[in-house]
Amino acid sequence: MINPSINTPKSWLAFELNILHRFEFKSIALPFTGNPALGNYLKRGDVRVMANDPLQSAWTRALATIQNNGEKLSDDQVNAVLEDVYVPRHKLLNPALRTWFSETDSWWFDNIKQNLERLQTPLAYAMAASLAMSVGDYVLSFNEHTRELRQPLSNVFRRLWNALPEPVNNGQNNTCQNKNINEFIAELNGIDLMFLRLPATGGVRYDDSDKAAWREEWLRGGNDFWEEFEISRNGKLGAPVETKSQYLRLLEETLRTASHIKKWAIAHVDSGFVSTQDIAEVIGKINRVEAVYTKDFSELTGMKAVIITA
């Protein structure tokens, strides 16, 4: 199961915003959204945000914050989502949950998923699903030595709901899509800036410790979709590759698809597989490289963040 996008560490958000604030733009495209925090912050500056991610879980979280300009979950909606969530049925509708959670926790997530269908709007569904995904991340943050410190999951859901910030209404028609990257980029019109977080190099694959994998399996209702998902990524930026030249070829194809967009900011993790110079040379074939910004996070993460503007 491949990892099509990269979730940058939270400490990099300030770096990304610092670079983006140096430019004037009223609209931005995020082909790989991952964490929606950047898009949500940009909305505060009245920027129109066009977000996308091939993962349904990332797309759902983006809907809840980026596309949502004002809708909030009500008490009644939260009560409906949490109704009878610990009551087991004949069998789990999503047995893949047992890969990640205990039997009791699996029932909670299985029932939550079914209760989401009671919500009347796509944004309400996305907000409640995002809260449930945060609860799952909370559960997976404990180990056998700290598990006794956990709170009941329904209590955690309510606490997260009560802590939600007010939706940011920037008065813009922000959109979120769940498409492959080249299709999303090709359909963009009138966008001032593309901020492209490059996917992990070297064909990183999900394993049983990858939080993004459990979210996707929970939201899709099982784990039998991965083969089809891999096929849909084949030959596109984000697919697993064996060589540097393969990665750079896929990057070039994507950037040529984006040649109609005025300005680019390309975020890259300098991990050694593909160098910043390699990426800058590919960008330079299509657009003029203006600047390269770097931030060393090696003491925290062992990596260096790079943003190339063109």
Regions found by a protein language model. Name each.
Residues T65-R118:
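Conserved phosphoryl-transfer catalytic core
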Residues L237-N287:
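Conserved Class I SAM-dependent methyltransferase catalytic core
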Residues L63-Q77, L160-G171:
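Short, conserved SAM-binding/catalytic segment
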Residues L55:
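Conserved SAM/SAH-binding beta-strand->alpha-helix loop
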Residues M1-R44, A58-R61, Q67-N68, S134:
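S-adenosyl-L-methionine
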Residues W12-L13, N18, W100-K211, R220-L237:
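SAM-dependent nucleic-acid methyltransferase catalytic core
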Residues R150, R158, F273-A310:
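Class I S-adenosyl-L-methionine
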Residues V47-N52:
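Short beta-strand element of Class I
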